[in-house]
């Protein structure tokens, strides 16, 4: 009996000492130390067991964790150690994500190009003599211009071409033209060979023994013949007395271009002999950019203009132009949002557009309406717009070589959705599937790296598709925003649009999407 009383006294003293100790120390009897757990890590186990018939206190939870289980009771009559408390559960996981949208598409300086080399009625390629005609057809949008070049044969390096602005194929109100455009054509000196008297000089194209011969011009700039004072100065007839150029709209966005070598085209040399003036085969190009073939008052580009202007040979220039022809696809400003996994905030594949602003991005590259609607979208957690390219002081689309970035915090159960227009189209946009991209896997590991394979080209179904970069209602050619014919009526993968026979790039060939996590 005395021994039992001593044991009780001893236990009471021990309890008092434990109460004065630190929170995480082990305590005797019922005052077991509490287990602690940091954020994102398990709490430690409980303290030592309590006294007889008393369960040890469970380990307390770490920050945002689950408390450990209580310790087991000691044996009756014995101040044995109680069971240890269980470990606290893991705290919630969070990470900071930076998303980069980079335009990796090639840049094309021309929309299309070609060669004209066979006069109408002839069976073989060759120059056009007076009375003969070259014809070719171009496909062009409202913002695109016509360029061409053909040599004035019997000279050293003279050629006919429009100036650097090209020839507009539409009026300002969008009406396609049918007109005589000769007044927009000039006679140019390529600046690559010193001028001699036409038809007489030893290195003029009709007299030279081989191609690319003659004296180097002392002025190497491309310039209009009326300003040339170097070499043999000759009074050439007016352009309209030598050739006639007409453009005729045929249908849709197609135009037929006719270059007539006038039957009266001739010049008289110093020996008072009148010579007919043939035209050489040439090249044509359609572009929305200026100076598609050359730049006035700059040296001729080293990609074939010299061979055309000196020898009437378009092959080298044609090959160069062909490698630079195609469509340049910018990506537009857009909107992004973080949302609960399982929600479909921006659209549902196969269903009509929600009317929350996706149409404005898909048709016009305008993220403002969708940005203003984000908080009302299904599963919305946070979001915003991206409209300023990295390194730029102003908002705008990203051409090839540029990128957008945006940053946010996310936790398991969160997904990412975004939309950005494939510019040069009617209503095509980049985006993940309608459920978005989950940002954590089943083990709560954050998604990182290149996620381009999870991004697709979608058709918003709000506007009928036309030929990219050419159609009158594509974003680069439309006269006003939100114009065009009715669309398919549902959001769907672009590849699923059966009424569209035009060619498009893959999403990954234009937009590279990566995620960095910290």
Regions found by a protein language model. Name each.
Residues 1-18:
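Sec-dependent bacterial lipoprotein signal peptides
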Residues 130-250, 391, 397-518:
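Mature, soluble, non-transmembrane domains
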Residues 15-92:
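Ser/Thr-rich, Pro/Gly/Ala-heavy low-complexity intrinsically disordered linkers and tails
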Residues 93-178, 251-254, 263-434:
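Structured domain cores in non-transmembrane regions
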Residues 15, 31, 37, 42, ...:
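Compositionally biased regions
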Residues 27, 312-315, 365, 484, ...:
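Glycine-centered secondary-structure boundary/capping sites
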């Amino acid at each position: 009996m005395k021994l039992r009383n001593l044991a009780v006294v001893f236990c009471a003293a021990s309890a008092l000492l434990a109460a004065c100790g630190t929170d995480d120390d082990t305590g005797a009897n019922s005052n077991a130390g509490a287990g602690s757990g940091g954020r994102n890590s398990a709490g430690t186990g409980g303290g030592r067991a309590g006294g007889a018939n008393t369960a040890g206190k469970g380990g307390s939870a770490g920050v945002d964790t689950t408390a450990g289980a209580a310790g087991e009771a000691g044996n009756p009559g014995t101040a044995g150690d109680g069971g240890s408390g269980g470990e606290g559960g893991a705290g919630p996981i969070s990470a900071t994500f930076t998303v980069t949208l980079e335009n990796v598409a090639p840049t094309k300086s021309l929309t299309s190009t070609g060669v004209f080399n066979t006069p109408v009625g002839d069976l073989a390629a060759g120059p056009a003599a007076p009375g003969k005609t070259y014809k070719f057809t171009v496909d062009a949008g409202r913002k695109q211009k016509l360029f061409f070049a053909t040599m004035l044969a019997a000279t050293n390096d003279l050629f006919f071409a429009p100036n650097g602005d090209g020839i507009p194929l539409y009026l300002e109100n969008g009406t396609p033209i049918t007109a005589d455009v000769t007044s927009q054509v000039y006679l140019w000196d390529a600046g690559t060979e010193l001028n001699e008297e036409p038809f007489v000089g030893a290195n003029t194209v009709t007299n030279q023994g081989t191609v690319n011969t003659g004296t180097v011009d002392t002025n190497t700039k491309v310039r209009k013949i009326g300003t040339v004072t170097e070499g043999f100065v000759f009074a050439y007839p007016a352009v309209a007395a030598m050739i006639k150029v007409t453009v005729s709209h045929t249908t849709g966005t197609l135009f037929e271009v006719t270059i007539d070598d006038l039957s009266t085209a001739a010049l008289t040399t110093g020996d008072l002999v009148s010579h007919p003036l043939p035209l050489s085969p040439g090249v044509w190009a359609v572009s929305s950019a200026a100076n598609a073939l050359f730049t006035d008052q700059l040296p001729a580009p080293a990609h074939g203009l010299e061979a055309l202007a000196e020898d009437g040979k378009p092959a080298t220039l044609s090959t160069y132009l062909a490698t630079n022809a195609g469509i340049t696809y910018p990506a537009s400003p857009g909107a992004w949002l973080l949302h609960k996994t399982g929600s479909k905030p921006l659209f549902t594949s196969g269903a009509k557009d929600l009317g929350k602003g996706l149409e404005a991005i898909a048709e016009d590259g305008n993220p403002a309406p969708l940005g203003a609607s984000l908080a009302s979208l299904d599963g919305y957690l946070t979001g915003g717009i991206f409209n300023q390219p990295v390194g730029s002081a102003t908002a705008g689309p990203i051409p090839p070589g540029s990128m957008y970035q945006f940053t946010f915090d996310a936790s398991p159960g969160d997904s990412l959705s975004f939309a950005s227009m494939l510019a040069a189209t009617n209503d095509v946009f980049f985006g993940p599937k309608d459920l978005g991209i989950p940002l954590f896997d089943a083990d709560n590991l954050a998604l990182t790296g290149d996620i381009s394979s999870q991004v697709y080209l979608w058709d918003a179904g709000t506007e009928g598709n036309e030929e990219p970069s050419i159609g009158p209602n594509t974003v680069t050619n439309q006269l006003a925003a939100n114009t065009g014919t009715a669309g398919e009526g549902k959001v769907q993968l672009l590849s699923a649009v059966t009424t569209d026979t035009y060619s498009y790039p893959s999403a990954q060939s234009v937009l590279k999407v990566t995620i960095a996590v910290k």
